[in-house]
Amino acid sequence: MPEGPEIRRAADNLEAAIKGKPLTDVWFAFPQLKTYQSQLIGQHVTHVGTRGKALLTHFSNDLTLYSHNQLYGVWRVVDTGEEPQTTRVLRVKLQTADKTILLYSASDIEMLRPEQLTTHPFLQRVGPDVLDPNLTPEVVKERLLSPRFRNRQFAGLLLDQAFLAGLGNYLRVEILWQVGLTGNHKAKDLNAAQLDALAHALLEIPRFSYATRGQVDENKHHGALFRFKVFHRDGELCERCGGIIEKTTLSSRPFYWCPGCQH
């Protein structure tokens, strides 16, 4: 599943294609959304936001399209009039004079009014977004030490969107390697230096993944163009200590780590 940086890049691409342009055609596959088609003709997208792995397309009439790609959903940008050759099932079409954005295969799609943005079950449940520039290491540290999260092993905590939105498996692996911790550690057991390092890494690594999308590198995952230190590198040498990177399973997901320097 794409993680926060990849969802944010998808949002950037959608914004670049149609933001501010009047919608000339709107189509939704799901019957409960059909009524909104005519309401959106002539309106425009004001911005495309993200909350973790959810994408929020905001319109000029104050409606917001909520979509979560889950495992299979994917957005495409095409020239208006172009029909992509695909076996995927079309769910959403937002068309302007020159560009059209298409959502395929996703099933978690809703239209929200302003007051629903604070009451929607997923949006209520997720924690602060790691790509939110207003989120600071100090706030992350407070969350790590809160009664809700301080006793949880990082193996599961760093996959829990209620803790921080936008994290996923490759980020979990890379963050824990960066700070020399394992998936079995808990925030309550860390010293001040470890806690500080983790709080910074939880923000810096996702933001670095997002920001370095233009760099060329062979180690790619869902378009994250930054160099993996351990993810998908089992059997290779750890660049920090020279140990052998291992692969195991933690919280039902593949986990990569170096026993030589993560302990």
UniProtKB/Swiss-Prot annotation:
State where DNA binds: 70, 125, 169
Name the residues annotated as catalytic in the UniProt entry.
2-3, 53, 253
List the keywords (alphabetical). DNA damage, DNA repair, DNA-binding, Glycosidase, Hydrolase, Lyase, Metal-binding, Multifunctional enzyme, Zinc, Zinc-finger
Return one GO MF term.
class I DNA-(apurinic or apyrimidinic site) endonuclease activity
Reported EC number(s) for this entry are: 3.2.2.-, 4.2.99.18
Q: Which InterPro entries match?
A: DNA_glyclase/AP_lyase_DNA-bd, DNA_glyclase_Znf_dom_DNA_BS, EcNei-like_N, Endonuclease-VIII, FPG_cat, MutM-like_N-ter, Ribosomal_uS13-like_H2TH, Znf_DNA_glyclase/AP_lyase
PROSITE patterns in the cross-refs: FPG_CAT (PS51068), ZF_FPG_1 (PS01242), ZF_FPG_2 (PS51066)
Q: How is the cofactor bound?
A: Binds 1 zinc ion per subunit.
State any GO BP term from the record. Answer: base-excision repair
Catalytic activity annotated for this protein?
Answer: 2'-deoxyribonucleotide-(2'-deoxyribose 5'-phosphate)-2'-deoxyribonucleotide-DNA = a 3'-end 2'-deoxyribonucleotide-(2,3-dehydro-2,3-deoxyribose 5'-phosphate)-DNA + a 5'-end 5'-phospho-2'-deoxyribonucleoside-DNA + H(+)
Determine the domain of life of the protein's source: Bacteria
The cofactors it requires, by name, are: Zn(2+)
Enumerate the residue ranges forming zinc fingers (FPG-type). Answer: 229-263
Q: What does this protein do?
A: Involved in base excision repair of DNA damaged by oxidation or by mutagenic agents. Acts as a DNA glycosylase that recognizes and removes damaged bases. Has a preference for oxidized pyrimidines, such as thymine glycol, 5,6-dihydrouracil and 5,6-dihydrothymine. Has AP (apurinic/apyrimidinic) lyase activity and introduces nicks in the DNA strand. Cleaves the DNA backbone by beta-delta elimination to generate a single-strand break at the site of the removed base with both 3'- and 5'-phosphates.
Alphabetical list of HAMAP family matching this protein: Endonuclease_8 (MF_01253)
For this chain, the family text in UniProt reads: Belongs to the FPG family.
What is this protein's record name? Endonuclease 8
